[in-house]
């Protein structure tokens, strides 16, 4: 909704209707990455956010493709996209914080979000484990969710007895 409403307001009337959800003067947290997360970072920057932090659940990817990630798989490597680069120029640092799990949202007396509680996590044997003593509270007046998806919902596959692979996607034979 954030990106859509801002683009619509800009294109319809140059923000004259004040209908867009603005990051101006706010501590912004973007939960999740990818293209949508980068767009949320860039839009928040252009609106004059006070700060921007981007939470990533997984660890920072390696600089080069690992042997366990061969071609033709999508290369899982560290990338700096336009939003990260712009944020670095404005705030002097990359906005991404890795291996963070959001535990709860904090609200102010009026019921608006005012912060987030997190804990660091590590991936062990395919399972995310919380790291004791790493709890942290972050200021946030605007939280944007950009978590995407890893696999389809499974109620269809369960009802139709469709097998799923190790990533939770429907199993299929190539070419069928």
What are these regions (language model features)?
Residues 1-25, 124-176:
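FAD-site-proximal beta/loop scaffold in flavoenzymes
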Residues 16-18, 85-95, 99-141:
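A structured beta-alpha segment of the ubiquitous adenosine-cofactor-binding alpha/beta core
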Residues 23-34:
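Beta1/beta-strand and adjacent pyrophosphate-binding region of the FAD-binding site
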Residues 32-33, 56-59, 98-101, 106, ...:
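Active-site proximal loops enriched in glycine and acidic residues that flank catalytic Cys/His/Asp
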Residues 37-38:
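N-terminal Rossmann-fold NAD(P) dinucleotide-binding loop
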Residues 41-100, 104:
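Rossmann-like dinucleotide-binding cores of NAD(P)H-dependent redox enzymes
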Residues 44-47, 121, 160-162:
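Short, solvent-exposed amphipathic alpha-helical segments in soluble enzyme
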């Amino acid at each position: 909704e954030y990106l859509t409403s801002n683009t619509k307001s800009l294109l319809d009337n140059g923000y004259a209707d004040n209908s867009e959800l603005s990051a101006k003067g706010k501590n912004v947290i973007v939960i999740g990455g990818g293209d949508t997360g980068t767009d949320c970072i860039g839009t928040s920057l252009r609106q004059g956010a006070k700060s921007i932090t981007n939470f990533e659940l997984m660890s920072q990817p390696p600089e080069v493709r690992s042997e366990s990630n061969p071609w033709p798989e999508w290369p899982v490597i560290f990338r700096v996209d336009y939003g990260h680069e712009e944020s670095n120029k404005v705030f002097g640092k990359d906005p991404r914080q890795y291996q963070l799990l959001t535990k709860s949202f904090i609200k102010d007396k009026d019921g608006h979000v005012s912060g987030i509680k997190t804990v660091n996590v590590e991936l062990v044997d395919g399972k995310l484990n919380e790291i004791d003593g790493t709890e942290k509270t972050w200021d946030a007046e605007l939280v944007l969710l950009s978590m995407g998806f890893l696999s389809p919902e499974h109620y269809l596959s369960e009802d139709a007895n469709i097998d799923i692979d190790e990533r939770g996607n429907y199993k299929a034979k190539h070419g069928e």
